[in-house]
Amino acid sequence: MNTVRVTFLLVFVLAVSLGQADKDENRMEMQEKTEQGKSYLDFAENLLLQKLEELEAKLLEEDSEESRNSRQKRCIGEGVPCDENVPRCCSGLVCLKPTLHGIWYKSYYCYKK
């Protein structure tokens, strides 16, 4: 039983003394690993940032095409009176003087082109 304890103690002492690394070596190794990790993280961050900027540019481009200012404002439908000088007929319609059945009305109406 004593030989087992002595053997175990001897192996333990050898493992501790031979396996113990220098603290400075450990620190240097950890610093190198963290620097490599930081450079990888910086690269990944820059790549992600570029992709996000591309997506944002596409979204802003689509928004500018479909913004409220570029939409057609309220318009007058077919068969509705309109102003001859400032026609607000919807697209595909023209402000014209009525023919035949609408002659007695003295205003213009929106008709299909």
Curated annotation (Swiss-Prot):
Q: Where found, per UniProt?
A: Secreted
Q: Where is the signal peptide?
A: 1-21
Query: What Gene Ontology cellular-component terms does the record carry?
Result: extracellular region
Tissue and organ expression note: Expressed by the venom gland.
> Main location per UniProt?
secreted
Output the InterPro entries linked to this UniProt entry: Toxin_22 (IPR012627)
Keywords from UniProt, A to Z, are: Disulfide bond, Ion channel impairing toxin, Knottin, Secreted, Signal, Toxin
Propiece residue ranges: 22-74
- What Gene Ontology molecular function terms does this protein carry? sodium channel inhibitor activity; toxin activity
Disulfide-bonded cysteine pairs: these are C75-C90, C82-C95, C89-C110
According to its UniProt entry, what is the function of this protein? Probable ion channel inhibitor.
UniProt lists the family membership as follows: Belongs to the neurotoxin 14 (magi-1) family. 01 (HNTX-16) subfamily.
The Swiss-Prot or TrEMBL note on domains reads: The presence of a 'disulfide through disulfide knot' structurally defines this protein as a knottin.
What's the protein called, per UniProt? U11-theraphotoxin-Hhn1u
Q: Tell me which species this is from.
A: Cyriopagopus hainanus
